[in-house]
């Protein structure tokens, strides 16, 4: 799926927790509503359903027909339908990698459900953030932020972002998450899947990215799309994205087969200082410590030569975390 040189760059950044993920409805297609029967719809299917509900032409965009919904319809068709969902195989693969941050155009909670179901195996804990929340960086890599750009079914009081007016409003600098995404998408490594490059606000974000704007010391940015057309291929060239023709679950399965299991957070973050920690101290407590403080290397000479490395007082304090 990738050239050896691109795969090597991807591995270095992915296994260091440098990759961001941007996903759309396509990654939730094998997830189900809470009745465990009806699968979650694609954006196109959902738009057609709402058009039929409001008795308008089926070619009306979702952004327009959404404005016709009354509060009860919003509760039934969006909030209840997309909350307490059952995660499918695709989103269940995401927690097996370490991500810098996850952005999603989806309002469903399938990804959160995947992290919850696999808490004993997930590389990180998840922290959900709705589009209306103030910007806050994650305190440590042990928590991955899932930023819901269009709203979140578990927080219906904040509303949903489907109208063209709201798209324009939320693509301006007054919304911190939109601003952060537009800035980081231009330079940092991203894997994008489950969404069309013609998504209204995605076009805005990509306008900040060119074929040469990505950082050369990080992995390549990738669009995973099973059925790209000529326009998609051209857009990838313009924005410096590598196009992978596959489903997202196929791509993640291929990565696991090629690269093996991603390293643990403990391996990435913790320096090698055997004997400093109490043996019973959980790994996440060690990670919290090293992502909350600066490591000061010993500089005083010891009586026997070399540097003094008496960590006994540190060991006592860490054992109390």
Task: Tell where the protein language model's regions lie, with residue ranges.
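SIR2/sirtuin-family catalytic core signature
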Residues: 1-21, 27-29, 89, 97, ...
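Metabolite-binding pocket within alpha/beta catalytic cores that recognizes anionic/polar moieties
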Residues: 2-4, 8-20, 27-38, 63-128, ...
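A secondary-structure boundary/capping signal
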Residues: 23, 106, 149-150, 193
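Short catalytic helix/loop segments, enriched in acidic residues and glycine
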Residues: 36-54
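N-terminal structural subdomain of ketosynthase/condensing enzymes
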Residues: 51-65
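Short acidic/polar capping segments at secondary-structure boundaries
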Residues: 107-110, 151-155, 196-198, 228
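Active-site gating loop/helix substructures
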Residues: 121-186
